[in-house]
Amino acid sequence: MITDPIADMLARIKNAQAARKSEVYIPHSKIKEKIAQILKKEGYIEDYTISEENKKGNQGTLIIKIKYLDNRNTKPAISGLRRVSKPGLRKYVGADEIPYVRKGLGIAILSTNKGILTDAEARKEKVGGEVLCYVW
């Protein structure tokens, strides 16, 4: 059993990029789907789909198409991923304490009472929450 599914998702994306894969298969959950939606909207991945094939129990598969900046799959769009809030040590921030990732060149993904948001959206909505991860 995976104790931290979000860290597992980020590690799978990082490993797929290192191996120059075009897509990665991740067990589906609603929070992972929202994170994939944000990554697509921000331009870090090409696309994502949910497959009901190879279904284990009630869980489908989230298929993420990795985005590369060149034709040879050598320069991934995501140069770094970091899990911030972990099951053993949660990291919460207020609306005025939301961090800037790489001086504004990256994004922070937060879990707020208004759903999963990027740092810019959370600042605009003036809500704080749990910092899930940084992407740059």
From Swiss-Prot:
Pfam families according to UniProt: Ribosomal_S8
Keywords assigned by UniProt, alphabetized: Ribonucleoprotein, Ribosomal protein, RNA-binding, rRNA-binding
GO molecular function: rRNA binding; structural constituent of ribosome
GO cellular component, one term: ribonucleoprotein complex
This protein's record includes keyword Ribosomal protein: yes
Keyword set includes Ion transport: no
InterPro entries to which the protein is assigned, alphabetical: Ribosomal_uS8 (IPR000630), Ribosomal_uS8_CS (IPR047863), Ribosomal_uS8_sf (IPR035987)
Taxonomic superkingdom: Bacteria
Any one biological process term the GO annotation gives: translation
Function: One of the primary rRNA binding proteins, it binds directly to 16S rRNA central domain where it helps coordinate assembly of the platform of the 30S subunit.
Family the UniProt entry places it in: Belongs to the universal ribosomal protein uS8 family.
PANTHER family in the record: 40S RIBOSOMAL PROTEIN S15A
Quaternary structure (record): Part of the 30S ribosomal subunit. Contacts proteins S5 and S12.
Protein name: Small ribosomal subunit protein uS8
